[in-house]
C-alpha cells in the first residue's frame, strides 16, 4: 500500500522553489552526487534544475551506481525495469538484480536494449536454463558479431551449429555476420541466403550470396553444379521480375535461355523479356511466342515477341493454331489480323480444328469473338461429319422453326462442294422434316419444294420417303412426279427416274394420269434410257 509520501513523489511534476537539500532528501527527491530530481512530463527527469534525461536512462545510471532509492523512485515514475537490470549489470550490482529478479520474467526480452557485447552476454547468463547455442542465436539476432568471434573455436567444432547460425543470420538479414561466417567457418549449404534474398527482394544479400559462393568454389573442393545453380537463379529471378538479380547472376556466368524467359512470360514480366529478347536466337523467340500463347500472355508481351520476329510466323502456323485451341488463347489471332502489312489470317485454320475437335460452347465463343457466320461453321461441321454441331448451330442461328431451318440448310447444300458434306446436310434436313408436323395440307407447298430439292440432289431414299408422304396428302402429286422425272432425266439420275416411273404406273392404273400425259412426259430426250413403255402398251391391249 502506497504511503502519502510515495503518492506525492509519484505525482509531483513541479517542485516549489527553492527547496533545500535536507527537504529534498526527506521527500526522497534528492540523488546523491547529482542533486535534486524532478519529473518532467511522462518520460523525462530534470537533475539539479539543469540536466534532462529520459527516465529509462536515469534508471540505468541509478542502477549502475546501486542507488536503490532512486531506482525505486524512477520505477514509481513508470520507468522500464529492464533498464535497471542493464545498469545493475554494468555496475555489477547483483544485489539489486536479485531484488528485482522475480519481476524480470524472460531475460531474453532485455537483450534488444543492450549495445555492449559483454553486458549482453552477462544478461543472457541470468537465465540458468539457456546454453551456448541460445546465446549465439541471440547474438546473431541482435548483431553481436564480437560474441560470435569470441566463441569461434567452439562454433567450429559443431558443423551443424555453424549451418544453423548461418541460416538464422540469413533470415535476420545480418550481412556482417553472414560474411564473417562465410569466410571464417565452413558452410555446407548456401541456398538459404539466396532463398531469403529472393523472398525479400534484397539485392545486397543476393550479391553477398554470390560473393560467398565464388569464395567457396575457389577455395574448397565443393561439389557444386554451378551452371545448373546459375540457371535456377536466373529462372527464379525472371519469375519474380528481378532484373538486377539476373544481371548479377550473369556476371558470374549465367546464361539467359528459353527456360529463363519462359518464366518471365509466365509471370507477366514483360520488361525482362524486352531486355533480353534481342540476345536470343530467332528460333528461340518462336518457341517463346508459342509458350506465350500457351500461357495466355497479355497483349504487350505478344506484340513484343511478334515484332521481334517481324510478324513472320508462317513456319510455326500449325503450332500456333494448336496452342490457340488447346489453351483457349485467341489473342494472337486478333493481333495477326490487326496488321496492315504481313497480315496473317488464322481464323479459318483455328475454326477448322475447333469444329473437328472442340465442343459446341468453344465454337460458339470463337464465332462471337471473330464474327464468324453460322453457314461457315455448318459447312465445316458437315465436312467433319459432326451432325450434332450442324443441328445445334442451326437452331442457335435461325431458331427452332422447321421451315426456316430447312430453308437455310437447303441453301447451304446448293453451295456445298464435297458430296459427303452435302449428304450430311440433306440427312439433317430430312431429320428436321421427320420430327416436324409438315404432313398437313397447309404445308403442301413446302413438301412439294422439298421433294424437288431431294430429286435435284439425287437423294434417293429421302425422295422415295417424301413421295410416299406426299401421296397421302392427295395434292399436286402428279405434277410433282412429272417435274421430278424431268429433273432425273436432265441430271442423269436413273434411280430417281425409276421411282418416278413406279409412281406414274400406279397413278395410271388408278386413273389419275392419262396415257397422253405419260407419253408427253416420256417424250423427253433420252427418256427411253430410264423407262420402258411396254407396260403402257400392254395396258392398252388389256
Swiss-Prot record:
UniProt key word Cell membrane = no
**Per the record's keyword annotation, is Cytoplasm included, yes or no?**
no
Tell me the leader sequence span. Answer: none
| Keyword entries, A-Z | Early protein
The entry sums up its family as follows: Belongs to the asfivirus MGF 505 family.
- Purpose of the protein: Plays a role in virus cell tropism, and may be required for efficient virus replication in macrophages.
Q: What is this protein called?
A: Protein MGF 505-10R
What species is this protein from? African swine fever virus (strain Badajoz 1971 Vero-adapted)
Organism phylogeny: Viruses, Varidnaviria, Bamfordvirae, Nucleocytoviricota, Pokkesviricetes
Amino acid at each position: 500500500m502506497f504511503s502519502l509520501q510515495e503518492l506525492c513523489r509519484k505525482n509531483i511534476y513541479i517542485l516549489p522553489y527553492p527547496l533545500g537539500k535536507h527537504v529534498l532528501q526527506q521527500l526522497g527527491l534528492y540523488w546523491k552526487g547529482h542533486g535534486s530530481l524532478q519529473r518532467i512530463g511522462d518520460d523525462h527527469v530534470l537533475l539539479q534544475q539543469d540536466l534532462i534525461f529520459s527516465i529509462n536512462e536515469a534508471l540505468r545510471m541509478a542502477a549502475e551506481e546501486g542507488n536503490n532509492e532512486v531506482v525505486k523512485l524512477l520505477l514509481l515514475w513508470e520507468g522500464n525495469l529492464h533498464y535497471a537490470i542493464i545498469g545493475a549489470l554494468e555496475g555489477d550490482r547483483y544485489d539489486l538484480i536479485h531484488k528485482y529478479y522475480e519481476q524480470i520474467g524472460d531475460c531474453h526480452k532485455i537483450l534488444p536494449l543492450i549495445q555492449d557485447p559483454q553486458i549482453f552476454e552477462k544478461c543472457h547468463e541470468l537465465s540458468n536454463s539457456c546454453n551456448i547455442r541460445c546465446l549465439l542465436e541471440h547474438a546473431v539476432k541482435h548483431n553481436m558479431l564480437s560474441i560470435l568471434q569470441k566463441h569461434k573455436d567452439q562454433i567450429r567444432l559443431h558443423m551443424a551449429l555453424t549451418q544453423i547460425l548461418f541460416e538464422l543470420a540469413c533470415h535476420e538479414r545480418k550481412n556482417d555476420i553472414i560474411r564473417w561466417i562465410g569466410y571464417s567457418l565452413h558452410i555446407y549449404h548456401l541456398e538459404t541466403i539466396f532463398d531469403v534474398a529472393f523472398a525479400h527482394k534484397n539485392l545486397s544479400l543476393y550479391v553477398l550470396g554470390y560473393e560467398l559462393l565464388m569464395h567457396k568454389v575457389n577455395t574448397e573442393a565443393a561439389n557444386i553444379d554451378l551452371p545448373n545453380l546459375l540457371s535456377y537463379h536466373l529462372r527464379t529471378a525472371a519469375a519474380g521480375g528481378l532484373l538486377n538479380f539476373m544481371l548479377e547472376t550473369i556476371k558470374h556466368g549465367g546464361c539467359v535461355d528459353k527456360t529463363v524467359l519462359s518464366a518471365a512470360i509466365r509471370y507477366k514480366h514483360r520488361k525482362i523479356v524486352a531486355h533480353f529478347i534481342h540476345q536470343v536466337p530467332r528460333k528461340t523467340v518462336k518457341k517463346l511466342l508459342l509458350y506465350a500463347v500457351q500461357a495466355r500472355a497479355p497483349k504487350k508481351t505478344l506484340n513484343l515477341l511478334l515484332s521481334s520476329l517481324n510478324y513472320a510466323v508462317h513456319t510455326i502456323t500449325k503450332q500456333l493454331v494448336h496452342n490457340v485451341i488447346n489453351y483457349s488463347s485467341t489473342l494472337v489471332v486478333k493481333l495477326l489480323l490487326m496488321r496492315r502489312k504481313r497480315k496473317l489470317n488464322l481464323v479459318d485454320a483455328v475454326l477448322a480444328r475447333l469444329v473437328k475437335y472442340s465442343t459446341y460452347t468453344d465454337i460458339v465463343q470463337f464465332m462471337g469473338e471473330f464474327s464468324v457466320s453460322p453457314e461457315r461453321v455448318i459447312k465445316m461441321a458437315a465436312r467433319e461429319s459432326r451432325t450434332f454441331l450442324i443441328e445445334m448451330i442451326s437452331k442457335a442461328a435461325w431458331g427452332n422453326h422447321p421451315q426456316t431451318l430447312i430453308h437455310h440448310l437447303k441453301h447451304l447444300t446448293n453451295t456445298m462442294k464435297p458430296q459427303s458434306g452435302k449428304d450430311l446436310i440433306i440427312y439433317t434436313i430430312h431429320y428436321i422434316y421427320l420430327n416436324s408436323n409438315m404432313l398437313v395440307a397447309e404445308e403442301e407447298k413446302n413438301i412439294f419444294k422439298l421433294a424437288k430439292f431431294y430429286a435435284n440432289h439425287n437423294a434417293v431414299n429421302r425422295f422415295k420417303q417424301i413421295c410416299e408422304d406426299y401421296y397421302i396428302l392427295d395434292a399436286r402429286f402428279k405434277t410433282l412426279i412429272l417435274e421430278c422425272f424431268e429433273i432425273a432425266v436432265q441430271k442423269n439420275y436413273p434411280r430417281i427416274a425409276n421411282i418416278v416411273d413406279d409412281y406414274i404406273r400406279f397413278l395410271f392404273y388408278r386413273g389419275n394420269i392419262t396415257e397422253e400425259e405419260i407419253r408427253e412426259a416420256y417424250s423427253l430426250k433420252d427418256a427411253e434410257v430410264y423407262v420402258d413403255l411396254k407396260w403402257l402398251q400392254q395396258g392398252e391391249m388389256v
